[in-house]
Curated annotation (Swiss-Prot):
Family, per entry: Belongs to the MurB family.
Cofactor(s) of this protein: FAD
Disulfide bond positions: none
Catalytic activity reported: UDP-N-acetyl-alpha-D-muramate + NADP(+) = UDP-N-acetyl-3-O-(1-carboxyvinyl)-alpha-D-glucosamine + NADPH + H(+)
Biological source species: Sinorhizobium medicae (strain WSM419)
Protein's recorded name: UDP-N-acetylenolpyruvoylglucosamine reductase
UniProt entry keywords in alphabetical sequence: Cell cycle, Cell division, Cell shape, Cell wall biogenesis/degradation, Cytoplasm, FAD, Flavoprotein, NADP, Oxidoreductase, Peptidoglycan synthesis
Active site feature: R183, S232, E302
GO BP: cell division; cell wall organization; peptidoglycan biosynthetic process; regulation of cell shape
GO cellular component entries: cytosol
Pfam short name (any one): FAD_binding_4
Length: 324
């Protein structure tokens, strides 16, 4: 397996990087970025100053170099061998804007926390956004995966999405062009979302506040929100609840190394100490196999897994055991 070498990649970009205003970091530790606090190095991390800076940088990066965008790292599992190519981490200064965009409309930057969108909607009496108060992560991730909770989801509120493609060209996508499905967007995978326009409706602030309080109380009661976790580990299969399938297969509280399926909510995987990316993914694949053996249902990952395995620590998908 090729090891990451950020300095070499940075030098290959040439003199054009002198025009970049954002931060470029070779061999950046991803365990400082993700909520799991695990994983290897990013070969090169770029934090753009704004959208113009992002487009300028992307035009410098050769087409064969992979590019991965991360938000706040809430739904991301990085493997221990690191991430080859460029990791783009959007900054709050350039991509965290949150402002009114017309009657019952809000413009939100991709790195804006989901709960902040809910809070602004409350401040202005705009209904339809309460569910974001219970979703960890940022708007960019919500746009990509059609995030939802408590009977609400992103596709019901989004009007248009602004993005930059791998070549640095800008695009504006309508809701239909986003191709939304359950926890899925059909938008091109190379698109980097920069901001979006959302639309709600007039609603009494007291009603919105009550709905948000109910979401908060539910999360605090049934989810391990103070642990190092990436949120829901697996999608709910049609007609089933993932947590119930995991529980019935005897996997509540299961541990591999320092990785554990939370005893509080067994569809939440947590890092109880210094878990490696290998331990976390190995645990997840073991749970998938046990659920299949018990119920015949195949769980699909909701958490995004990226990067390379360390040599000798490869994991076969859906077998839950190392191939080494």
């Amino acid at each position: 397996m090729k090891q990451v070498n950020g300095q070499k990649l940075l030098e290959s970009l040439g003199n054009g990087v002198s025009a970049i205003r954002g931060r470029i970091t070779p061999d950046a530790p991803m365990d400082r970025v993700t909520w799991f606090r695990a994983g290897g190095l990013a070969e090169l991390m770029f934090q753009p100053h704004d959208t113009d800076d992002l487009t300028t940088f992307l035009k410098l990066v050769p087409e064969e170099v992979p590019v991965l965008v991360v938000g706040v790292g809430s739904n991301l599992l990085v493997r221990d061998g690191g991430i080859p190519g460029v990791v783009i981490r959007l900054s709050a200064k350039g991509f965290g804007d949150l402002e009114l965009a017309g009657e019952h409309r809000i413009k939100a930057g991709a790195i804006c926390p989901d709960k902040n969108l809910a809070a602004m909607a409350l401040d202005h009496g705009i209904g339809g956004f309460y569910f974001y108060y219970g979703i960890p992560g940022s708007i960019g991730g919500a746009l990509r995966m059609n995030a939802g909770a408590n009977a609400g989801e992103t596709s019901a509120r989004v009007l248009e999405v602004h993005a930059v493609d791998r070549k640095g060209d800008r695009h504006v996508l309508s809701k239909s062009e986003m191709g939304y499905g359950y926890r899925h967007s059909g938008a091109a995978k190379d698109l980097i979302f920069t901001h979006a326009i959302f639309e709600g409706y007039a609603e009494d602030k007291a009603k919105i506040r009550n709905d948000m309080d109910a979401v908060r109380q539910h999360r605090e009661t049934v989810q391990p929100i103070r642990e190092k976790t990436g949120g829901s580990t697996f999608k709910n299969p049609e007609g089933h609840s993932a947590w119930k399938l995991i529980d019935e297969a005897g996997c509540r509280g299961m541990m591999i190394g320092n990785a554990q399926m939370s005893p509080l909510h067994c569809n939440f995987m947590i890092n109880t100490g210094q878990a490696t990316g290998y331990e976390l993914e190995y645990l997840g694949e073991t749970v998938r196999q046990r659920v299949m053996d018990h119920s015949g249902v195949k769980l699909e990952w909701e958490i995004k897994r990226v990067g390379n395995f360390m040599p000798g620590y490869e994991i076969k998908e859906f077998l839950g055991r190392a191939t080494a």
